[in-house]
């Protein structure tokens, strides 16, 4: 047992150098009583107890990283591996088998005998874009690899030079690391506000025996609950990076700051270094963390095993011509310990940027420290506040004098202690998600504690909700006797986490912990609100949200089991609230821009969610799912036609037209044109069935008729049809010298139009009737949004649209009296995945229909290009991990494919449903 009374800055304490160079075998200095003040600058009598220490742990030791695209990188026995979630049969989701990303053979042996012989991977971290992966070894060497898609070759962007392999002992080990976020607008969701509630909302879900079908708003009206959502604009925090640059920053045990920068996409990373302090024995650090600030700088907190905390302000001056310049200012050096005085070792340290409107304007960052002993863990939360000192700045600078780091600041920084919590459950790691707006602490038994750090509404007209826990969700503890994780990686949506065991990566999904017998209508509605809000957060922050949809599916199954009368109502409530939370209304205005529908990524995610929650085992999809599947196809067709027609029309002056490229582009649209023509035939088959069955046909669920009556989907269909007409016009304009390829392209397009069972002229006439009458109906109805949701969520034709539906049948009857429609009876459109037909005759739409990505002869269909896949030597098949669609992969480096301006280039990384492409060998 040793005792000492440290001075304010700990500069005169004598320590055993060996304990500081090697992983320290020291206990944290502690006090038997709580310090009397909240600021941590008081001299305290402290004790080092070597008998009660735990296993030492350094910073920057994250063995798993989950990127925004859904790819999980982890350190395995053979090197760095990657996994991702895939849907195997339409309902069950599993982790793929690991794929070796960076083998451990890339670790180069030390070049001198003074280096610790063991070198292993210890830290992985994805870049903000999710394309570059930083890999750090135990001696501080940094490797950066990049992969544009899961099928593209892996590129090494940074490999440590030979001089980095002569590290003395482990002083160059990196103990703090982060990627520098690019400067871009930050949009954050505010907590939702719910209000109201009646006696029916208190009813147990198991007691709900009868519920009328209808529009989605009936469930809210039944419970008397209302809700509002909101978003806010956030500031970019941290250094401003020039457009196209990439950067990451780290600090070593000897307090050497390292900045790796990239001068453009796919360019190698270069290193810039700055020594923060002279190498004294008590300047060796074990943990460090970075956080961006509003003045476009960074704060760096470093912790020494001697019990000292160092705080620096880091500034980066960027230059496109020269290497960036680093400047550092030491703000303070103080003692840091638990307030309780219990002997413990610091095992985790994190700085978090300030996103909340509930903190002081002087607060620059939040710091959380975890101290661990043999009995449990203590978490201390602090605020870093900057004040203008009362003394002259000359006197103040004497207290922060440093020969290596600049000390010209005129502000004094304080560490203000806020909260200390103690638990007997060991904390394995802490972290944050969604731009530091959510803090989490992961325990070794699998329990996670979350805390919201974002903006708080000032309104008192409702109860706020934001986190999963606000609706009763939590993670179930790991089974007793199972492997205890040493690191837990939380997904970007906070709906799941993964951890490593001896058997590989394991996945756990958040569960609703409210017992089935206690679940009320109000709690069910709360669940819909929270799930919709968390889904909107993933849409706004553009992160993969497969795990959120998994939670939705579980809750739908639970509600359906407890209250069969709500089997359809709860999914419809989820859909309606998800659209409301993202502020996307299906009731579009007349002047709504077409590009906002085609390119809107949030709409794509909403449609994907509707498809996923309506898909069951065997890839069978109910009508709700098929409606969104059709909408996604229309979005794909309209985007591809627009993209291609613009590429063809943008002829550079003075440059001869590239006829080969032109023909290649036009031929690539053949499958999409076929999809539009077959959808028109499918619509006519529905009209034929309605004509034969009579008015009762309109009381059932449908796909084609609701799609042409709803305003948003009708806009896409009209736009696609006009694109096809423009495509035919271009093909009729023959060049001066027509090549054989051009002739074949023209012939192919003419054949598509010729062999369709319905003439394009009739469909245009029918479509004009629908468009004009639908506008008249919608203008005279107050609740147009409810009508749109009834069409696109349920596939039901509202009462207000029945006269229009009958008018369409009358127009079709007139047409078939003068035209031979016998081919329509036997025309197979099952490949669209929208309906099933047997024996060549239309059948009523079944409740469920399997999705087919193969023809009747077993040939696979390219779900992206809409043509039959013919396997050629060297071709690679890719599969969507979400919808199981199959497509041919074409490497973007192949210049013959004109991928830079080819419409398929937009879907090189992701499927048109938003899922990730994976190699067919991984399987789904």
From Swiss-Prot:
- What GO CC annotations are associated with the protein? mediator complex
Q: Where in the cell is it found?
A: Nucleus
* Source species, domain of life: Eukaryota
**Protein function:** Component of the Mediator complex, a coactivator involved in the regulated transcription of nearly all RNA polymerase II-dependent genes. Mediator functions as a bridge to convey information from gene-specific regulatory proteins to the basal RNA polymerase II transcription machinery. Mediator is recruited to promoters by direct interactions with regulatory proteins and serves as a scaffold for the assembly of a functional preinitiation complex with RNA polymerase II and the general transcription factors.
Subunit structure, per the record?
Component of the Mediator complex.
According to UniProt, the name of this protein is Mediator of RNA polymerase II transcription subunit 16
By sequence similarity, the record places it as follows:
Belongs to the Mediator complex subunit 16 family.
Q: From which organism does this entry originate? A: Yarrowia lipolytica (strain CLIB 122 / E 150)
Keywords from UniProt, A to Z, are: Activator, Nucleus, Transcription, Transcription regulation
Please name one Pfam family that this protein belongs to: Med16_N
Main location group: nucleus
Keyword check for Nucleus, yes or no: yes
Taxonomic lineage is: Eukaryota, Fungi, Dikarya, Ascomycota, Saccharomycotina
Biological-process GO terms, alphabetical? positive regulation of DNA-templated transcription
């Amino acid at each position: 047992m040793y005792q000492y009374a440290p001075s304010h800055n700990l500069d005169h304490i004598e320590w055993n150098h060996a304990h500081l160079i090697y992983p320290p075998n020291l206990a944290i200095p502690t006090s038997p009583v709580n310090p009397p003040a909240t600021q941590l600058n008081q001299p305290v009598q402290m004790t080092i107890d070597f008998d009660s220490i735990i296993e030492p742990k350094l910073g920057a030791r994250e063995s798993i990283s989950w990127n925004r695209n859904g790819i999980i990188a982890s350190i395995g026995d053979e090197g760095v591996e990657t996994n991702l979630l895939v849907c195997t049969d339409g309902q069950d989701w599993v982790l793929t088998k690991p794929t070796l990303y960076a083998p451990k053979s890339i670790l180069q042996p030390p070049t001198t005998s003074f280096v610790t012989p063991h070198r292993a991977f210890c830290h992985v971290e994805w870049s903000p874009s999710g394309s570059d992966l930083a890999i750090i070894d135990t001696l501080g060497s940094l490797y950066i690899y990049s992969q544009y898609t899961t099928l593209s070759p892996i590129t090494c962007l940074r490999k440590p030079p030979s001089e980095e392999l002569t590290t003395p002992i482990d002083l160059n080990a990196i103990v703090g690391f982060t990627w520098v976020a690019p400067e871009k607008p930050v949009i954050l969701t505010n907590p939702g506000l719910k209000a109201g509630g009646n006696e029916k909302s208190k009813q147990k879900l198991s007691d709900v025996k009868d519920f009328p079908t209808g529009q989605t708003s009936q469930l809210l009206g039944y419970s008397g609950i209302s809700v509002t959502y909101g978003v806010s604009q956030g500031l970019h925090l941290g250094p401003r990076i020039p457009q196209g640059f990439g950067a990451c920053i780290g600090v070593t045990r000897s307090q050497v700051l390292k900045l790796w920068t990239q001068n453009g996409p796919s360019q190698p990373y270069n290193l810039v270094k700055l020594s923060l302090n002279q190498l004294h024995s008590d300047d060796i650090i074990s943990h460090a963390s970075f956080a961006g600030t509003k003045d476009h700088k960074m704060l760096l907190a470093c912790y020494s095993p001697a019990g000292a905390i160092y705080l620096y302000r880091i500034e980066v001056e960027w230059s496109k011509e020269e290497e960036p310049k680093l400047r550092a200012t030491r703000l303070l050096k103080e003692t840091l310990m638990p307030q309780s005085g219990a002997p413990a070792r610091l095992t985790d340290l994190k700085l978090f940027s300030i996103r909340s409107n509930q903190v002081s304007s002087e607060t620059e960052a939040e710091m959380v420290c975890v101290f661990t002993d043999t009995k449990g863990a203590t978490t201390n939360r602090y605020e870093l506040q900057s004040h203008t000192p009362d003394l002259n700045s000359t006197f103040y600078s004497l207290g922060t004098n440093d020969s290596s780091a600049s000390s010209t600041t005129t502000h004094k920084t304080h560490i203000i202690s806020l909260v200390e919590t103690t638990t007997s459950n060991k904390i394995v790691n802490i972290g944050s998600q969604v731009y530091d707006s959510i803090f989490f602490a992961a325990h070794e038994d699998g329990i996670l504690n979350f805390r919201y750090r974002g903006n708080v509404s000032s309104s008192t007209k409702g109860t706020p909700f934001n986190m999963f826990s606000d609706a009763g969700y939590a993670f179930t503890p790991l089974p007793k006797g199972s492997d205890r994780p040493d690191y837990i990686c939380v997904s970007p949506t906070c709906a799941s986490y993964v951890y490593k065991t001896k058997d590989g990566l394991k996945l756990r999904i958040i569960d609703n912990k409210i017992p089935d017998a206690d679940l009320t209508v109000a709690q069910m509605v709360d669940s819909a609100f929270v799930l919709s809000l968390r889904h909107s957060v993933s849409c706004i922050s553009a992160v993969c949200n497969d795990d959120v949809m998994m939670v939705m599916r579980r809750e739908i199954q639970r509600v359906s089991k407890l209250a069969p009368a709500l089997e359809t109502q709860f999914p419809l409530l989820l859909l309606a609230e998800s659209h409301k939370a993202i502020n996307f209304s299906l009731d579009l205005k007349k002047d709504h821009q077409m590009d906002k529908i085609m390119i809107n990524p949030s709409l794509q995610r909403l449609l994907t969610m509707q498809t996923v929650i309506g898909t069951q085992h065997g890839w069978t999809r109910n009508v709700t799912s098929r409606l969104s599947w059709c909408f996604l196809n229309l979005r794909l067709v309209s985007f591809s036609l627009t993209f291609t027609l613009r590429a063809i029309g943008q002829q550079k002056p003075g440059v001869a037209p590239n006829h080969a490229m032109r023909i290649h582009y036009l031929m690539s649209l053949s499958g999409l044109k076929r999809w539009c023509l077959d959808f028109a035939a499918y619509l006519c088959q529905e009209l034929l069935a309605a004509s034969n069955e009579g008015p009762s046909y309109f009381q059932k669920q449908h796909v084609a008729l609701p799609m042409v009556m709803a305003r948003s989907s009708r806009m896409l269909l009209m736009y696609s049809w006009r694109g096809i007409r423009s495509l035919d016009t271009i093909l009729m304009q023959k060049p001066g010298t027509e090549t054989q390829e051009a002739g074949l392209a023209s012939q192919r397009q003419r054949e598509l139009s010729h062999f369709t069972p319905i003439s394009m002229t009739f469909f245009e006439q029918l479509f004009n009737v629908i468009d004009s009458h639908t506008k008249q109906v919608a203008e005279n109805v107050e609740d147009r949004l409810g009508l749109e949701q009834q069409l696109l969520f349920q596939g039901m034709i509202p009462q207000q649209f029945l006269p229009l539906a009958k008018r369409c049948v009358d127009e079709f009857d007139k047409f078939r009296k003068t035209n031979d429609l016998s081919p329509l009876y036997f025309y197979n459109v099952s490949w669209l995945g929208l309906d099933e037909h047997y024996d060549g005759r239309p059948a009523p739409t079944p409740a469920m229909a399997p999705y087919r990505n193969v023809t009747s002869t077993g040939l696979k269909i390219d779900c992206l290009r809409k043509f039959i896949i013919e396997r050629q030597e060297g071709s690679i098949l890719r599969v969507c991990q979400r919808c199981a669609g199959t497509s041919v992969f074409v490497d973007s480096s192949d210049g013959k494919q004109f991928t830079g301006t080819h419409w398929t280039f937009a879907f090189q990384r992701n499927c048109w449903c938003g899922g990730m492409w994976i190699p067919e060998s991984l399987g789904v």
